[in-house]
Amino acid sequence: MSTANRTFTGLLGTKLGMTQVWDENNKLIPVTVVQITPNVVTQVRTPEVDGYGAIQIAYGQIDPRKADKPSTGHFDKAGVTPRRHLTEVRTADFAEYTLGQEITVGAFEPGTKVDVVGTSKGKGFAGVMKRHNFKGVSASHGSHRNHRKPGSIGASSTPSRVFKGMRMAGRMGGERVTVLNLVVHSVDAEKGLLLVKGAVPGARGRIVFVRNAVKGK
């Protein structure tokens, strides 16, 4: 089913860290705590004007003096103070939203599945064994200072080049990662907290995007 014909809820929040809680069966559950203060609608896109239906939401208060003039005008049009982060959510019920409307963490219900999008932790420059799970070279049988090397990266005169996509050493992490079908353990609407079973991408204090599960049943 196309996302244009489905209703989605998506909110920006901040990853606070992980903890453990007990469920109704006295089982210890690892959860990630995401703080989601109210997101505000700053733009409503329509098929007639933009070619598709979606809402733009903003998150994170900033000093209005630090916003540039185009951003200030955009937020003034929506009747809200400048925010730090913006994103779009395609949804079939875009017409039900209005500029300046606040969306809280109460939009998610315990027991439902969500997808969490974030930026993975940066690991710096890493070799092929850490970055791509290479096995490495034999520890003996004449191997000399080759134990963590990748091995051959291609032939010589034919094709006389290294193929694109060759797995090699390089910067690891710091990439956009989406974790699918995480279960919402509980919602604290008063404190703006969302507890999700399992781990989500990124370090503590990083921005994450939480939405209804795209592939969840």
Curated annotation (Swiss-Prot):
GO terms for biological process: translation. The keyword Ribonucleoprotein applies. Keywords: Ribonucleoprotein, Ribosomal protein, RNA-binding, rRNA-binding. It comes from the Bacteria. It holds the Pfam family Ribosomal_L3. InterPro entries: Ribosomal_uL3 (IPR000597), Ribosomal_uL3_bac/org-type (IPR019927), Ribosomal_uL3_CS (IPR019926), Transl_B-barrel_sf (IPR009000). Part of the 50S ribosomal subunit. Forms a cluster with proteins L14 and L19. This is Large ribosomal subunit protein uL3. It comes from Clavibacter sepedonicus (Clavibacter michiganensis subsp. sepedonicus).
